[in-house]
Amino acid sequence: MLAVALQGIGGMNSFAAGVLQTLRNEGVKPDLISVTSGAILSAYYFLQKDSNAIEKYYDEYFKSEENGIPTFFKFMQYAYLGIPEKFSPNYLNIFERLPDNGPFSTLEEWINFYFPNKIYKSEFPQQFFDDIANFFSTNEEVGIIMNAYNVNNDQAVLYVNERALDTMELNKSEHFEVKPITPDGVRACLQLLQYGDFKGEYDGAYQYNPVLSPLVVADEIILVTVAPLGKSLDPIDNIFDIEDFKLKMLFKNALYAELNDISRINKLIEYGNKLVRPESANKPYKEYKPIKVQTIQPTIHRGFFEYFVETREFYQDGVFQAKKFMDDNLNK
């Protein structure tokens, strides 16, 4: 059984897209997919009947973006003016925010108005969430899991389709709750911190990027990251490097913990221990087996000013690294 786990966030999503397009071209068909944040869209195109859906989407995107404007200035443009049908800055919605902050009788109300927790307003059309939810929830061939974060109970929320529910390690625990994939679920999984919460939930990338533990039923996991693992970041010389550092650590810390858990399972089995999963109503307990984890990761560091900007270079790095991955595995 093969599982694919995809990290995702902002302008770094194009790497996973390049990887997925290459895997599709090579005929790789995962049984399970764990996907976080913006990589949800790449997975959506990856599973379409059109085998070139990802490439077509990004080709159109890059044509519209390659206008000679340097990345730094694009970042500033998007940060201050937003991106049509994606998000708009909340300072442009000042009159809409007035009723939520009045009557301005306390200092806190003034502070909340001038320094809101909702920096941006999501502008994705409802059809966007409907299409993804319907496509994922009705997929009978691939188990799909997306994750959000519930800020009220400090738990991961796993949105899954029926195939995932029947296959993955999804016994309810104190660490996460399991829900069926719905349009609201897709929205929650894409709810950036800067938008404010959606029904108490945020984008899952702030907690797990991606979720790996339910994939331990697989024989092999292909992990696709948005930043190089096991490599140092660029030197921290200024405040923007500090923001870059915090962003990368957000992606890495929980991931390292989950990889260590899988390594611990493998070590215990190697040392002769018999490990079994708890028995449930629809799944008799099964013995754990060694889990092979392979990583496809970028060779390019992307930083704070690339947060909103996807590039063809990063997409092509995904294509190249996936081809290298396939060649290395074929030659073993």
Could you tell me what each predicted segment is?
Residues T36-S37:
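Catalytic nucleophile serine of serine hydrolases
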Residues I40-S42:
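Transmembrane-helix signature of multi-pass solute transporters
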Residues M1-I33, Y44-K332:
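Patatin-like phospholipase
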